[in-house]
Amino acid sequence: MEGCILADSRQSKTAASPSPSRPQSSSNNSVPGAPNRVSFAKLREPLEVPGLLDVQTDSFEWLIGSPRWRESAAERGDVNPVGGLEEVLYELSPIEDFSGSMSLSFSDPRFDDVKAPVDECKDKDMTYAAPLFVTAEFINNNTGEIKSQTVFMGDFPMMTEKGTFIINGTERVVVSQLVRSPGVYFDETIDKSTDKTLHSVKVIPSRGAWLEFDVDKRDTVGVRIDRKRRQPVTVLLKALGWTSEQIVERFGFSEIMRSTLEKDNTVGTDEALLDIYRKLRPGEPPTKESAQTLLENLFFKEKRYDLARVGRYKVNKKLGLHVGEPITSSTLTEEDVVATIEYLVRLHEGQTTMTVPGGVEVPVETDDIDHFGNRRLRTVGELIQNQIRVGMSRMERVVRERMTTQDVEAITPQTLINIRPVVAAIKEFFGTSQLSQFMDQNNPLSGLTHKRRLSALGPGGLSRERAGLEVRDVHPSHYGRMCPIETPEGPNIGLIGSLSVYARVNPFGFIETPYRKVVDGVVSDEIVYLTADEEDRHVVAQANSPIDADGRFVEPRVLVRRKAGEVEYVPSSEVDYMDVSPRQMVSVATAMIPFLEHDDANRALMGANMQRQAVPLVRSEAPLVGTGMELRAAIDAGDVVVAEESGVIEEVSADYITVMHDNGTRRTYRMRKFARSNHGTCANQCPIVDAGDRVEAGQVIADGPCTDDGEMALGKNLLVAIMPWEGHNYEDAIILSNRLVEEDVLTSIHIEEHEIDARDTKLGAEEITRDIPNISDEVLADLDERGIVRIGAEVRDGDILVGKVTPKGETELTPEERLLRAIFGEKAREVRDTSLKVPHGESGKVIGIRVFSREDEDELPAGVNELVRVYVAQKRKISDGDKLAGRHGNKGVIGKILPVEDMPFLADGTPVDIILNTHGVPRRMNIGQILETHLGWCAHSGWKVDAAKGVPDWAARLPDELLEAQPNAIVSTPVFDGAQEAELQGLLSCTLPNRDGDVLVDADGKAMLFDGRSGEPFPYPVTVGYMYIMKLHHLVDDKIHARSTGPYSMITQQPLGGKAQFGGQRFGEMECWAMQAYGAAYTLQELLTIKSDDTVGRVKVYEAIVKGENIPEPGIPESFKVLLKELQSLCLNVEVLSSDGAAIELREGEDEDLERAAANLGINLSRNESASVEDLA
């Protein structure tokens, strides 16, 4: 048991009290006080991992125009930076009335302080928001009078420090959306009938009509305006004022343009305009003025057409226009249209370059729509900005109408503006948009990954039904931008991704990744961020290309990648850039898989996804074998407490830490204690420092859920043996030691929230009370005088949490009852029990109660007088049927929990914790788990390379600090730059002996194991080591379900399905066939009638069982009556005949008394015996 004791002893360590088993050092890490992981990395990373939440926070700061964003924009050299809200107000202003005599303009958006802190918003179901004010100016153009006012524009949801929003008390995340960028796209297709290569181009705006040009099989160039009918492109040019001579002068080099001009029958601008108008507005009488206005509005007016800054940038870049000039206009220009047509013509004629009028030469080539140079991110700021734009445009209509109806003298900005459309648009986005999602709070990593998620779905994006293979596939331009591993399995595969570790989003929304600049074959530490299309023009070397001390490449020819992901060797002088890190291409979750390079990508995908499903355990334990990403991920996830300034710890308790800063100020950090996360897991923070300790700014001073010493700790280090065991671990089943149950090694706490409200009803107000009719004192024992369960009470399913009574409809009273009323007053008033009870299959301990009352001036929904929330915590030990997984996609369900004495044990008597089957490794090709097991054993037992005998080759490659390690050392093996196979073999041969002087595991990683039942050794050595195992959210307690009687469907009267509805198991068509095959006629009859939807029969059978009588004959199922009704609704006269041909009359809905009897039977079996079902019927 020695290994287990050592592993658990690490729990009591703190950042302030270093010990040999866990040395403390900040030498290898930029975070002060961080645990010192000995790293197998060979490469120096010149760039730290950027802020992992920057994709969310930076975007929101741009939206609100925060001072921090303005500073960073000034550093980038942006001229006159404009925030997102300012941009919308600028676009909207001025709003003019129909005559142009009045105008209203908006400027200077600003915020007041937020109304309540984050914790209070969560507690009271409020939205974390700040009041938004703008300056509105009303100008009377006739008199020149200006009225200016500050106008309240509603409460604006604000982002928390963690990159989330609190909407009505729930934490939500706005996911970034991957969309096709506005711009001009050239495409190539093969005509099926002639096998000709045809070319087309689309000009896609951010907002407005599409413009499409194409060359058809008859070699004419056509145009489609706003997806209407095709017409010759020369018609559009003539409509823009070009003469035939000008067209020939510009496009005379092209045969297809000359033939198009010959086939065009229109003469002059006017005729061309009318021709376009007829195509766009068929049925309306065309006039030259209306045609001119229509064409101008479609493409050349900012109100109707917007390429956006990014679209303008893409068009200029593709066509070589206005290169180097600042972007001013966001509409199309005549020059754009002409350059696009020329580019298309030259592309069709096979030319490779084109010189535009400015003298710039641009390459002529088709576009790949799945290339990351053509796909951009709509981050949270832009998504909210678009929604505000929608709300503002709705408000604009209201303002215009009010300008015409109100008295000019009395008008003020306040009287014109109705903020409801804007507030409604923002609420609609946060409450119902596909991109505003309930935050995944299973553990800190799942929350962090959710904030870095990229989705191609949502409004303006793709739909999973129409998305093909190409858009889902991994593309070479994803390198360093979107992780090729982490994506969901199932229908969303490839449509939802995750941002790579070093990636960032530029102001245009394109994802950039950093590279080290290479100058004349020398690698510098200068970092350059490149977008995907900029990278295509360069030659990039890998991060692990060998370089000497001066930064020169060691080898004369270097492995590089060029455009479209082609890999080749080139002379070192031709290299332009080099990767900054080997983990540059993967996401945070994928970067936390050690030995990722030895795993098949499919299994690595499962490993990355399953880390997000790990539940926080009662005691967290950092992995012995990490990747160096654990610390940064935990800090950026925001669930640990970090010291803001340097100082000394003055006071520590379980609930708070007080720090005396060096500048003399104090700061108290409050701990989050046993709070419920969005997914019912337990979020608890514990201090890891002691009074008197010195802490630096940025140091972790308290752990959160799934963290240990500030590092991400999603599972436990368990002693694993990889072998079959009596067939009990067949098909990925797992065998566990009972030690893990007894010592709460894999125990987790789950907290459920139960809520009930007391409302006003038509018959009177509901009441929360202890005085509940027909309930015994035993049941009420745990309720206080208000009728609310006490904190600390153990509750099981069916127990009352909150007593509540609801008034019943007054029935006609008998004379005797009236007499009783007269004597005893209102006491006998009719109420029914509507108490909050513990749902089926749940139990636990009450750990918290929150009561909100209108009397205490709490904000409650209309009609609600009182609201009570009860929190029930459940301690779940690991049990058969729970799902466990490693980090390599090696998942399984616990098939058997063995007593410790029956588990296989090592030569020193240490029993293993977990047995995995060998069959789970070879065909799945996730060899990383085996290497992790070996290195885990080395880390647990410690090692020492004896330098006196000479340092072997494998050890010569390692830094000096890796030549010796104490037992329980924590190591990191970064992805693509970790421990090599030779190093692992060497370390296994150098492991330290145990206290008896025995080395238990051989140099090949195998040990002699003994059968716990017989004490005999197994016939062959077995791989033994330490593997990091996580307990996943798929717990058997949540899945197991059984029903006796329960709710029925209203129409068919058949039992409902599913655990949530307390439903039954469906006995389907194929199961019926199985019964028929066995000839089990009576069982089948019962299944189809009294166990299902024979309403009368059900009650009679229940009655018979209770009384111990024989089961009566079944009646007619309700579904048969439903079938009859459906046939009758089709005007078919259907009759039911008995076996002798006589018509049977089906009674419409059996007696109400019978239904009442059924209800009573279902709930209360101790009712009066005299009232039998037969008597009632």
Swiss-Prot record:
Pfam families cross-referenced by the UniProt entry: RNA_pol_Rpb2_1 (PF04563), RNA_pol_Rpb2_2 (PF04561), RNA_pol_Rpb2_3 (PF04565), RNA_pol_Rpb2_45 (PF10385), RNA_pol_Rpb2_6 (PF00562), RNA_pol_Rpb2_7 (PF04560)
Enzyme class: transferase
Coiled-coil segments: none
GO biological process: DNA-templated transcription
GO MF: DNA binding; DNA-directed RNA polymerase activity; ribonucleoside binding
Region feature Disordered, mapped onto this chain: 1-36
Keywords: DNA-directed RNA polymerase, Nucleotidyltransferase, Transcription, Transferase
Superkingdom per UniProt: Bacteria
Stretches with biased composition (Low complexity): 17-32
Catalytic activity entry: RNA(n) + a ribonucleoside 5'-triphosphate = RNA(n+1) + diphosphate
CDD domains: RNA_pol_B_RPB2
GO CC field: DNA-directed RNA polymerase complex
The EC number(s) this enzyme carries: 2.7.7.6
Gene3D superfamilies associated with the record: 2.40.50.100, 2.40.50.150, 3.90.1100.10, DNA-directed RNA polymerase, beta subunit, external 1 domain (2.30.150.10), DNA-directed RNA polymerase, subunit 2, domain 6 (2.40.270.10), RNA polymerase alpha subunit dimerisation domain (3.90.1800.10), RNA polymerase Rpb2, domain 2 (3.90.1110.10)
PROSITE patterns: RNA_POL_BETA
NCBIfam families recorded: PRK00405.1 (NF001616), rpoB (TIGR02013)
PANTHER family (UniProt xref): DNA-DIRECTED RNA POLYMERASE I SUBUNIT 2
Matching HAMAP family: RNApol_bact_RpoB
Function: DNA-dependent RNA polymerase catalyzes the transcription of DNA into RNA using the four ribonucleoside triphosphates as substrates.
Subunit and interaction comment: The RNAP catalytic core consists of 2 alpha, 1 beta, 1 beta' and 1 omega subunit. When a sigma factor is associated with the core the holoenzyme is formed, which can initiate transcription.
Family: Belongs to the RNA polymerase beta chain family.
Entry protein name: DNA-directed RNA polymerase subunit beta
Organism: Mycobacterium tuberculosis (strain ATCC 25177 / H37Ra)
Lineage of the species this protein comes from: Bacteria, Bacillati, Actinomycetota, Actinomycetes, Mycobacteriales
Gene: rpoB
